[in-house]
Amino acid sequence: MAVAVGRPSNEELRNLSLSGHVGFDSLPDQLVNKSTSQGFCFNILCVGETGIGKSTLMDTLFNTKFESDPATHNEPGVRLKARSYELQESNVRLKLTIVDTVGFGDQINKDDSYKPIVEYIDAQFEAYLQEELKIKRSLFNYHDTRIHACLYFIAPTGHSLKSLDLVTMKKLDSKVNIIPIIAKADTIAKNELHKFKSKIMSELVSNGVQIYQFPTDEETVAEINATMSVHLPFAVVGSTEEVKIGNKMAKARQYPWGVVQVENENHCDFVKLREMLIRVNMEDLREQTHTRHYELYRRCKLEEMGFKDTDPDSKPFSLQETYEAKRNEFLGELQKKEEEMRQMFVMRVKEKEAELKEAEKELHEKFDLLKRTHQEEKKKVEDKKKELEEEVNNFQKKKAAAQLLQSQAQQSGAQQTKKDKDKKNASFT
């Protein structure tokens, strides 16, 4: 049974003044020191067609050269490739993960191109949820792979968004912070670029696509975020090559007709993107991922598992009540399954017994048949043996008679010879 515990309301809180220094004013410093020692993680998902400049822009944003293998247009499907890096600036360590959508937009049938991306984002949420639900959690050492920002690279067509872009962003907007950017903006004339930006934003609004809104509720960033929001989507140019401009070297793209400077705000919005993504709103992107997108996923998953905050009468549920209800439901299902399995087992045993009896009957019939056959064969052999024995006896009798006749004939011949001899001898005398 749940026990109701009273909680103080805001009206019950009293403001008190301190008579001396206590020391909790150092909490912000403690938090900064702890965060600095732990380091930070930031995960970026780059969604865009092959060859649109995703890797180059990442190299330019973080002022380094990341390892990246050039992708081909022959991928059978979309696959996501994640790579993690350890970066350090001053005394701040950042574990950066860049996830690339290899093969996106290269297939003839693009209907399911968004699915691997959604599945990857959900898989990272699920991994974090499973870690969070463990009895012995280790979130301090856990490598958080949830996507904090999705840079959606829009092809610089100058006309409108492709249906693939609209469908993909619509599928992703409830799962990740989408920041749309126009890639290779130096391929569009400036007047066309302004029209293209307006067209993109109107299409996003008309199709109900929710992109990341830069926070304006904090005084420290409200003004800059409000100013930068009107420039969405950012038209960017990426380059790691440095070109000499005047007396300085600057990152730029050299063309026969001139030079496009990456960090010149009159040429592109790269600086605005870097300010918004890294220097101003990186922590807000991390916070929005946890408090909005992950919480939505977590709530849906727990509701699927049967956990909820209120009963059908909108009365609050305690965790213990939810656990007991779920446990009883599980035990009921378990007993039902056990009974079904028992009945199935009994039925299978009966079927097996019937099969064994039938097999035993067949074996007995075969045995009886073999036994009769054996007896018949035995009788035939015995009869044949008797016939042979009779033939042997008859043969022996005939043989004995023949031998007797032969001996008698020999004796009679011998006697006759003797008589003739005696008669001859008598005549000489």
UniProtKB/Swiss-Prot annotation:
UniProt region (G3 motif), positions on chain: 100-103
CDD domains: CDC_Septin (cd01850)
BP GO terms, sorted: cytoskeleton-dependent cytokinesis; protein localization
Function: Filament-forming cytoskeletal GTPase. May play a role in cytokinesis (Potential). May play a role in the cytoarchitecture of neurons, including dendritic arborization and dendritic spines, and in GABAergic synaptic connectivity. During Listeria monocytogenes infection, not required for the bacterial entry process, but restricts its efficacy.
Cell division in keyword set: yes
Pfam family, one: Septin
Entry-annotated residues carrying N-acetylalanine: A2
InterPro entries according to UniProt: G_SEPTIN_dom, P-loop_NTPase, Septin
Disease: A chromosomal aberration involving SEPTIN11 may be a cause of chronic neutrophilic leukemia. Translocation t(4;11)(q21;q23) with KMT2A/MLL1.
Protein name in UniProt: Septin-11
Gene: SEPTIN11
Organism: Homo sapiens (Human)
GO MF entry, a single one: GTPase activity
Residue spans of biased composition, Basic and acidic residues class: 417-429
